[in-house]
């Protein structure tokens, strides 16, 4: 999302809105995106560029968090570690509309919900809302440590050979 805004749209927008009680991983960037202080404890200083205090299922909270640096909104369609809380379908639809209105990318973290774990290949299919970017892992590798980020065709302009890497090097 950051790279797309800077390389393709020429905008200095880098902040990603995430949600309280979310969990996005344990790398430095993904734990910074996580909305749980207990996960971040002991890792300061954390990288800038994430706002992790939006209230899940509250569109007004997201609207209030958007500023001129915001490039994307990222959420889990089911907050697993946050208490197994599913996103409200109306909230997800409103979030898509809001992102479109404000020129933001919508990112779904499908690490826990993707690959058939919710009854469809990806949970977003059940919401009738298509993200700009989504991530998958866990179920993708069936125990093998692998993950993927998938995005709409418009995003490929931001990536060329060598601009995105793998942990397998």
Q: What is each residue range found by the language model?
A:
Residues 1-169:
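Conserved N-terminal phosphate-binding loop of PLP-dependent enzymes in the Aspartate aminotransferase
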């Amino acid at each position: 999302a950051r790279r797309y805004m800077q390389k393709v749209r020429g905008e200095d927008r880098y902040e990603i809105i995430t949600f309280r009680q979310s969990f996005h991983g344990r790398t430095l960037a993904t734990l910074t995106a996580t909305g749980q202080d207990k996960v971040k404890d002991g890792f300061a200083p954390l990288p800038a560029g994430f706002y992790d205090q939006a209230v899940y299922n509250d569109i007004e909270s997201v609207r209030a968090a958007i500023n001129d640096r915001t490039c994307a909104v990222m959420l889990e369609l089911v907050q697993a570690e946050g208490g197994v809380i599913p996103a409200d379908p109306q909230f997800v639809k409103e979030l898509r509309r809001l992102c479109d209105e404000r020129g933001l990318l919508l990112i779904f973290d499908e690490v826990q919900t993707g690959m058939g774990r919710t009854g469809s290949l990806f949970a977003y299919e059940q919401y009738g809302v298509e993200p700009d970017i989504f991530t998958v892992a866990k179920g993708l590798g069936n125990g093998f440590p692998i993950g993927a980020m998938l995005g709409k065709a418009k995003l490929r302009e931001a990536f060329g050979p060598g601009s995105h890497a793998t942990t397998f090097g």
